[in-house]
């Protein structure tokens, strides 16, 4: 998509993501978008963690991976001619601002309980922060579901913003005092906006390459089948998702995910083989998309979201 399809119709485009989505879009903003995304896949696949790995060790490994990915090309990423990067993070309140496992665990328990009572109650625990390319405002209307604010993205906060956006509690340390966003502890933006159920602005199509055909509002909603995205916010969303038939052909019948590090603990070569096989299959999926688009047949696959 970023290697051929979008460059064939160049224009200013907003890229907005949380967690690994922000890393993927940052990779697409590098001078060679396709190579940047391939590089991210390679670097992540090569990660390996021993049993008992600490949050500090995973954070350090993530910093090294980000260094290898950007390779000193921060300015080129920020100056991309066509893409405007938006990185979503949350500022954590109370016990969630602490990386001590006991206190953080208590804080997460409170979040889970409040989320069951109502998603709006998460405003007690998190503030949404969108760190965006200052050349273009974030592609959203007024955000009034949670306390929210915008921060300009620049060379001084790019790497910290990306690290914060991927900082899952109990897995990685939070990022302290994010430049431009003030004092505090900043974490994975997916905690609030897991699948970006946002009030998108304008009349353009929102193209959403996704790993599932369901839009789940927040990270804590994953086990709540009744918690669904707002239909009004999806009116202009075109979601691209792998079919169940495609997933069934993958090794283990699923896409690779973070839990594979535990599933293959002590056997990194098997996990890496599995992930590489899945990436090879994804390239074939991309070829099929390009063929459908070139032949005007995308409409044959459209379903109501």
Describe each model-derived feature in a short phrase.
Residues 19:
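Catalytic nucleophile serine of serine hydrolases
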Residues 1-14, 27-305:
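Patatin-like phospholipase
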